Amino acid sequence: VKTCKGYRCENNTGEHPSCVLNINAIIGNRKMNDGEIAEFLEKRRILLDGFSTKDGKTFPTVLELADDGAVNMQSVIGRCPHCGGEVRVGTRAFNCSNYSNQEAPCSFAIWRNIGGHQLTLEEAKELCEKNITSSELEMYREDGSIYRKRLGLAPDKLQIVKI
C-alpha cells in the first residue's frame, strides 16, 4: 500500500499489524518510484543509482530486503575472481576493493555498460561467481546493428571478454 511516507504491507496497519514491512519513499536522499518498489519487492535486491550523502556526493548501491523487513544498502556484490577482494558497485563499473592496495593492487573491473548493454546486478554476480553469463546479452555495434554474445572472464581473470 502506498502511503504519504512510503510503502507498507497492507497487513501493517491498524492496532495489531501482522507484518512489519515498511519502505520509506525516500532512501539515501533519493525518491523511490512505484516501478522500483515493485521490482524490489519481487526480487528482494535491486541496483539503483542516484543516492546521495549528506554532503551531496552521489553514489549507486544495491538495496536488499531483509527477512525482518529491513531495507539495507549493500555496496558489495561478490568476490573478485582475480584476487578474492570485494567487488563493489561504482558509478560506471563494478570494481575490486583492492584497486588502491599498495602491496597487491588489483585492476579487476566490470563495466556497467558493455556494447550498449546495461549490465544487471544478476549478470555482474554471475561473472564474479561463475566467470561467465548464463545467457547471451543483446549488444550494439557502432553502426547500430544488434548482436548477441555471452560475457566471460579472460584467462587472467582481469578483463571481461565477449564470447
Can you name each region flagged by the protein language model?
Residues 1-163:
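Basic, low-complexity terminal or inter-domain segments flanking catalytic cores
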